[in-house]
């Protein structure tokens, strides 16, 4: 999940540098969603291993 978040963050950065505002915004949203999901899954996995 972190890998996908980084990939979409890089796509957003490149798209914004090239002037594609819509693509940059969409890629940024996907990167944020993947990052949040990855953090939530990490926390759930960490808690389930401790109990």
Curated annotation (Swiss-Prot):
The record lists the membrane-crossing segments as: 6-26, 27-47
Q: Name one GO cellular component term.
A: plasma membrane
Name the record gives this protein: UPF0391 membrane protein PsycPRwf_2202
Which controlled-vocabulary keywords does the entry list? Answer: Cell membrane, Membrane, Transmembrane, Transmembrane helix
Entry-linked Pfam families: DUF1328
Report the family membership. Answer: Belongs to the UPF0391 family.
Coiled coil (UniProt feature): none
Q: How does it sit in the membrane?
A: Multi-pass membrane protein
Q: Which InterPro entries match?
A: DUF1328 (IPR009760)
Localisation per UniProt entry: Cell membrane
